Amino acid sequence: MRPSGRKLDQMRSVSIEPNVMKHAEGSCLIRMGETHVLCSASIEDKPPPFLKNTGLGWVTAEYGMLPRATTSRNRREAAAGKQSGRTQEIQRLIGRALRAGVDRSALGERQIVIDCDVLQADGGTRCASITGGWVALRLAVNKLLKAGIIVSDPIVDHVAAVSCGIYAGQPVLDLDYAEDSTAGTDGNFVLTGRSRMIEVQMSAEGASFSRDEMGQLLDLAEAGIAELVAAQKAALG
């Protein structure tokens, strides 16, 4: 029995509210159960220096958590003077994941920055950030297309992410914190809307896992991604 009472293959409730910020070119608030992440997309009219005169654009991401996103207060990283290794790892993952769904030549020499701010954390914040970040990116690109700034759509497919793991000896979909903190195996799966894999991160936290178990987790992830892509489409109308 999962702590939440969910079935092994049951996602948490998912909602994506678009256009929640006035100034950002694209934004949304994604809720996956009790994990809530505010995602925004900002368009910058020049690429990073290493892409100057290449004709290619760039998508990057920044990630952070509010001090009371968790059960006890975490000190702001700005106050500490540096980002944690975890934060740097997560924002690089978000950027890599979203770039995989973009034709950077069609984007032109500009950069889109995705900001993911965790308002409340209950497991799966990086996955929620990728799924919501894609919606913010899609909305920002729509504005470029509508304004005639770019002529071809650079977004080639949906991108979404979900966690899966082995909890109490059973493969489960979409781990919350109670499960994630005690799972024997933990994994994050980033897929396209056509179930093509972008990134798979799996690790044995308490016990090693078999190839068959990995396949079971991938099957769960594909089903979960299909639900998340449906939520993305519903948010965009």
From Swiss-Prot:
EC numbers on record: 2.7.7.56
GO molecular function per UniProt: 3'-5'-RNA exonuclease activity; tRNA binding; tRNA nucleotidyltransferase activity
Signal peptide: none
InterPro entries referenced in this protein's UniProt entry, alphabetically: ExoRNase_PH_dom1 (IPR001247), ExoRNase_PH_dom2 (IPR015847), ExoRNase_PH_dom2_sf (IPR036345), PNPase/RNase_PH_dom_sf (IPR027408), Ribosomal_Su5_D2-typ_SF (IPR020568), RNase_PH (IPR050080), RNase_PH_bac-type (IPR002381), RNase_PH_CS (IPR018336)
Pfam families: RNase_PH, RNase_PH_C
Keyword rRNA processing appears in the UniProt entry: yes
Catalytic activity, as annotated: tRNA(n+1) + phosphate = tRNA(n) + a ribonucleoside 5'-diphosphate
Keywords, ordered alphabetically: Nucleotidyltransferase, RNA-binding, rRNA processing, Transferase, tRNA processing, tRNA-binding
Residues annotated as binding phosphate: 86, 124-126
Keyword Repeat tagged: no
Biological process according to GO: rRNA catabolic process; rRNA processing; tRNA processing
Entry-linked Gene3D superfamilies: GHMP Kinase, N-terminal domain (3.30.230.70)
Superkingdom as given in the UniProt entry: Bacteria
Function: Phosphorolytic 3'-5' exoribonuclease that plays an important role in tRNA 3'-end maturation. Removes nucleotide residues following the 3'-CCA terminus of tRNAs; can also add nucleotides to the ends of RNA molecules by using nucleoside diphosphates as substrates, but this may not be physiologically important. Probably plays a role in initiation of 16S rRNA degradation (leading to ribosome degradation) during starvation.
Membership in a protein family: Belongs to the RNase PH family.
Subunit note: Homohexameric ring arranged as a trimer of dimers.
PANTHER family: EXOSOME COMPLEX COMPONENT (PTHR11953), EXOSOME COMPLEX COMPONENT RRP41 (PTHR11953:SF0)
Identification of the protein by name: Ribonuclease PH
The encoding gene: rph
